[in-house]
Amino acid sequence: MFTLKKSMLLLFFLGTINLSLCQEERDAEEERRDEDNAKMEEIKRGILGTVFKAGKGIVCGLTGLC
C-alpha cells in the first residue's frame, strides 16, 4: 500500500511539473504573438501616416490651399 501511495505521489508531482512547463511555454508563445502583432500595428501606422502626409501634400499642391 505504501509503495502505491509513493507511486501515485510521484505521478502527481511529475504531472504538476509537466503542466507548469506547458503553461510557461504557452505564455512565451502568446508573448511572441503579441510582439509580432505590435510590430505589425506599428508598421501599419507608419505606412498610413506616410500616405496621409503624401495625400495632403498632393491636395495642397493641386489646389494651392495650404
Swiss-Prot record:
Cystine crosslinks: 60-66
Predominant location: secreted
Subcellular location: Secreted
A Pfam family of this chain: FSAP_sig_propep
Source domain of life: Eukaryota
Propeptide: 23-43
Signal peptide limits: 1-22
GO annotation (BP), single: defense response to Gram-positive bacterium
Tissue-specificity statement: Expressed by the skin glands.
One GO term describing the cellular component: extracellular region
Record keywords: Amphibian defense peptide, Antibiotic, Antimicrobial, Cleavage on pair of basic residues, Disulfide bond, Fungicide, Secreted, Signal
Family recorded in the similarity comment: Belongs to the frog skin active peptide (FSAP) family. Brevinin subfamily.
Purpose: Has antimicrobial activity against Gram-negative bacterium E.coli ATCC 8739 (MIC=50 ug), against Gram positive bacteria S.aureus ATCC 6538 (MIC=3.1 ug), methicillin-resistant S.aureus ATCC 43300 (MIC=12.5 ug), B.subtilis ATCC 6633 (MIC=12.5 ug) and against fungus C.albicans ATCC 90028 (MIC=50 ug).
Name recorded for this polypeptide: Nigrocin-2ISb
Organism: Odorrana ishikawae (Ishikawa's frog)
